[in-house]
Amino acid sequence: MFHLLIYPLWVLVALFAVIIANLLYQQLPRRPDEPPLVFHWFPFFGNAVAYGLDPCGFFEKCREKHGDVFTFILFGRKIVACLGVDGNDFVLNSRLQDANAEEVYGPLTIPVFGSDVVYDCPNSKLMEQKKFVKFGLTQKALESHVQLIEREVLDYVETDPSFSGRTSTIDVPKAMAEITIFTASRSLQGEEVRRKLTAEFAALYHDLDLGFRPVNFLFPWLPLPHNRKRDAAHIKMREVYMDIINDRRKGGIRTEDGTDMIANLMGCTYKNGQPVPDKEIAHMMITLLMAGQHSSSSASSWIVLHLASSPDITEELYQEQLVNLSVNGALPPLQYSDLDKLPLLQNVVKETLRVHSSIHSILRKVKRPMQVPNSPYTITTDKVIMASPTVTAMSEEYFENAKTWNPHRWDNRAKEEVDTEDVIDYGYGAVSKGTKSPYLPFGAGRHRCIGEKFAYVNLGVIVATLVRNFRLSTIDGRPGVPETDYTSLFSRPAQPAFIRWERRKKI
């Protein structure tokens, strides 16, 4: 019997010794140029639980104790958080030779997006790829997207069983995930791709999305069930796009004039003279679909949930359309120019992106020692630096009652000024560095999201269309929205999240 107990006992003793050694190590004097280390009980795992359950709360507590710059341990990695507007600027505008995103995000994204695109290619090539896909984000393209998006929303609410009858309930995150994949595919990718968005294709998208689980930051190639589904889905989805491309190469299908992304990419050439290979076109299309859907799905869900919690805002949005857009008492189909006539709608989108950013942490791998401005700290190459624009967006320093969702806070707030001299071209067009603003819902620097204008158009049209057709309320009639689910790479409302809808009378 003693022999059966001795081995577990030794394991416990060894574990206890490791914990004690870790605690003693944290008490040792640190070099003055090293950022303070956040306390943690267990080596390797470090602060993973506290950070994973509530990253924003974790940042807030650490900031109170250590200031804007501190180190925490995340599964063996030393993460140096650089918070505040200065921290955002330091991380997001870091020079490519000092810090890069590829080493952090490559292992996670390559199995999902595919090879030779985004983080599986030199940064200069990524900048060219971003320039190629801006074809679908021009002013002319955005104007053409509006009625396509509106039609997709109307088709969904007219045909989906969840919207049958005069009133019922609906699981908001589920519905908005479906609506946004339809709007993103139809507007950014074209009618041909949209037609292929059958239930089978949607299932492939879901399986591919499983690849964005946080565990895949560390173990992207583990033969876990969700990774096997991810890999199979990527192959099948790539085949869908390759079939379209091959048919077009043979001249069998006519492209849509001016709005078809596949046709655009088929005609693009890199600076070295090489046409974009068909495989890379397919991988860019997968990337574009997922990038266009993820943030819109989360943001639109939060908007609808807040509108259900605040029916007065919903009615203000409806009246705003009646006052500014109605013709002879009726609301005509939306046009791009209509969005500028709906300031409250824009403020609802803006406020939701402030309170509910889908990405709370932005990481870069340090390649050369970096001196943190206005501090004694030097960050060495064994570390990863991290910015969190969410921290400034939710700070009382910049926004009164920052944790309260209040679209009217933007009514009299001067538009964030952009220094026209602080502009840089990373290879895909001139953009503002923008990192001195406390409000950065689309990031900043060379990896700033190029789909900002599309996101505002997509969200604005979706919300305007829903408000035209429905009154919204919470199930029990009391205000409130769900907690945030941080278990995925992209923050989103905890599911399920049901609300009640009531169809408006036609005017």
Swiss-Prot record:
One of the protein's GO biological processes: sterol biosynthetic process
Miscellaneous comment text of the record: In Fusarium, the biosynthesis pathway of the sterol precursors leading to the prevalent sterol ergosterol differs from yeast. The ringsystem of lanosterol in S.cerevisiae is firstly demethylised in three enzymatic steps leading to the intermediate zymosterol and secondly a methyl group is added to zymosterol by the sterol 24-C-methyltransferase to form fecosterol. In Fusarium, lanosterol is firstly transmethylated by the sterol 24-C-methyltransferase leading to the intermediate eburicol and secondly demethylated in three steps to form fecosterol.
Cofactor: heme
Lineage: Eukaryota, Fungi, Dikarya, Ascomycota, Pezizomycotina
GO cellular-component term (any): endoplasmic reticulum membrane
Enzyme Commission designation: 1.14.14.154
Residues that hold lanosterol according to the record: 105
Function recorded in the entry: Together with cyp51B and cyp51C, encodes the sterol 14alpha-demethylase that plays a critical role in the third module of ergosterol biosynthesis pathway, being ergosterol the major sterol component in fungal membranes that participates in a variety of functions. CYP51A encodes the sterol 14-alpha-demethylase induced on ergosterol depletion and is responsible for the intrinsic variation in azole sensitivity. The third module or late pathway involves the ergosterol synthesis itself through consecutive reactions that mainly occur in the endoplasmic reticulum (ER) membrane.
Keywords of the record: Endoplasmic reticulum, Heme, Iron, Lipid biosynthesis, Lipid metabolism, Membrane, Metal-binding, Monooxygenase, Oxidoreductase, Steroid biosynthesis, Steroid metabolism, Sterol biosynthesis, Sterol metabolism, Transmembrane, Transmembrane helix
Membrane topology of the entry: Single-pass membrane protein
Binding site for heme: 449
Descriptive protein name: Sterol 14-alpha demethylase CYP51A
Reactions that this protein is recorded to catalyse: a 14alpha-methyl steroid + 3 reduced [NADPH--hemoprotein reductase] + 3 O2 = a Delta(14) steroid + formate + 3 oxidized [NADPH--hemoprotein reductase] + 4 H2O + 4 H(+); a 14alpha-methyl steroid + reduced [NADPH--hemoprotein reductase] + O2 = a 14alpha-hydroxymethyl steroid + oxidized [NADPH--hemoprotein reductase] + H2O + H(+); a 14alpha-hydroxymethyl steroid + reduced [NADPH--hemoprotein reductase] + O2 = a 14alpha-formyl steroid + oxidized [NADPH--hemoprotein reductase] + 2 H2O + H(+); a 14alpha-formyl steroid + reduced [NADPH--hemoprotein reductase] + O2 = a Delta(14) steroid + formate + oxidized [NADPH--hemoprotein reductase] + H2O + 2 H(+)
